Amino acid sequence: MALDIHAHRILILDFGSQYTQLIARRVREIGVYCELHPFDMDDEAIREFAPKGVILAGGPESVHEANSPRCPQAVFDLGVPVFGICYGMQTMAEQLGGKVEGSELREFGYARVDVVGKSRLLDGIEDHVDADGLFGLDVWMSHGDKVTKMPEDFHILASTPSCPIAGMFNDDLRYYGVQFHPEVTHTKQGGRILSRFILDICGCEALWTPSKIAEDAIAQIRAQVGTDNVLLGLSGGVDSSVVAALLHKAIGDQLTCVFVDNGLLRLHEGEQVMAMFAENMGVKVIRANAEEQFLNNLAGEADPEKKRKIIGRTFIDVFDAESCKLENIKYLAQGTIYPDVIESAGAKSGKAHVIKSHHNVGGLPEEMNLKLVEPLRELFKDEVRRLGLELGLPYDMVYRHPFPGPGLGVRILGEVKKEYADLLRRADHIFIEELRKADWYHKVSQAFVVFQPVKSVGVVGDGRRYAWVVALRAVETIDFMTARWAHLPYELLETVSGRIINEIEGISRVTYDVSSKPPATIEWE
């Protein structure tokens, strides 16, 4: 009987914290499967999920306010360990008979908590030991309310001068609560605390590993697809590349990929995709050269959102035309990943805002009547990358910087023209090449060049040049929600600028974008 890598699972209830997905990623890193669900998850669904433990995440609400979120009673009836984090601790305290009040002194940022109670959760975990033998932890706080009275039979776990009950526990029930955030890297021992709860207290086995995920996904694909044929839109990005490798391993020649070359790709990208998948891996790939169709449809349009929609519609037209030439296709594969699923579920329930629609083949006409295969829908991006390496994809492909679905179409400000795309492709290639040479490519999270439709005077030799301006953009980020502009060495910027201006006749000036997010976004359009 095949190993069920989902058997040992953790349920995470989301109360609206910006850190909730981070908790899930930390649990997965420990090697245990988990799922995120809204705080008002149905009691029957909780029982059917049958978790080995439950984590109550943080949230922006105040427990003592009317209609604030509450944990379902079913969680406390399961008889499994429960770990409340920040708001999760507060609602646990309130619901089990304790009391929560607003605090005059709010705690945001770094703090040191004293570990004052001996519990299974924090036993032997510390950052400091003072002269009196008191253990201390360096943690990240983000709260305005605090627990002022614990439920019956609970004990104080940790405290700070302004928050005497910064943690509480009941070892008999295996209920724990902390006011700080163990999931963020600023809490130095956060990983150990979560591991202690999940592996030791909940008794989970670390079954969620790249090799086991690959085996499970291949088995699931074969069971779902059988002998039918599958179609995949291959973009060359990480998600679709991993899906292609996974499907090819699972069903071989039953997979056909369509690679749409829209004329807005990076330098040599089309050739690289074909070489990797068609030549090296033996995947059936149809290359649709549609540059002229995309550029004709984009002609005269300068509005960023309208450009995105034109590119999306044209992609669907080209993909649909190619797929109609194929026979016996029953399934459409997509690179949907877990954050997409979470965002979609939140949008349907009204509990989250849709950031933007995803540019993929999800908008294909319904008359295609294909069933979906989404082998990555349980995985976060970092898990997709690790799975790609497990499947034998090159490191440089798996850890390539993000590239927007509309490609260079949103890195050319204003109207898109072939001349602009060709210049931008070459400039971007030089920037990335020099970042790699200087060992900076993997130190930054994303780097690219933006084409600006303005001209600037330059001097080349004895001649005057009036040519286009480009901007270099490089950022450092963990989650792409916030980002800091990368402080690249001046010598590196000088080299990149010199090469672009000297090697590309149509560019006379190079600027460097020093805007962080917020207030700026990472992409210019």
Swiss-Prot record:
PROSITE patterns: GATASE_TYPE_1 (PS51273), GMPS_ATP_PPASE (PS51553). It is an enzyme of class 6 (ligase). The keyword Cell membrane does not apply. InterPro entries: Class_I_gatase-like, GATASE, GMP_synth_C, GMP_synth_GATase, GMP_synthase, GMPS_ATP_PPase_dom, NAD/GMP_synthase, Rossmann-like_a/b/a_fold. The active site is at 86 (nucleophile), 181, 183. One of its GO terms (cellular component) is cytosol. Residues 9-207 form the Glutamine amidotransferase type-1 domain. Pathway: Purine metabolism; GMP biosynthesis; GMP from XMP (L-Gln route): step 1/1. Pfam families: GATase (PF00117), GMP_synt_C (PF00958), NAD_synthase (PF02540). GO terms for molecular function: ATP binding; GMP synthase activity. Keywords: ATP-binding, Glutamine amidotransferase, GMP biosynthesis, Ligase, Nucleotide-binding, Purine biosynthesis. Its EC number is 6.3.5.2. It comes from the Bacteria. CDD domains: GATase1_GMP_Synthase, GMP_synthase_C. The keyword DNA damage does not apply. It catalyses: XMP + L-glutamine + ATP + H2O = GMP + L-glutamate + AMP + diphosphate + 2 H(+). ATP binds at residues 235-241. Residues 208-400 form the GMPS ATP-PPase domain. Homodimer. Catalyzes the synthesis of GMP from XMP. This is GMP synthase [glutamine-hydrolyzing]. It comes from Pseudomonas fluorescens (strain ATCC BAA-477 / NRRL B-23932 / Pf-5). The lineage of its organism: Bacteria, Pseudomonadati, Pseudomonadota, Gammaproteobacteria, Pseudomonadales.
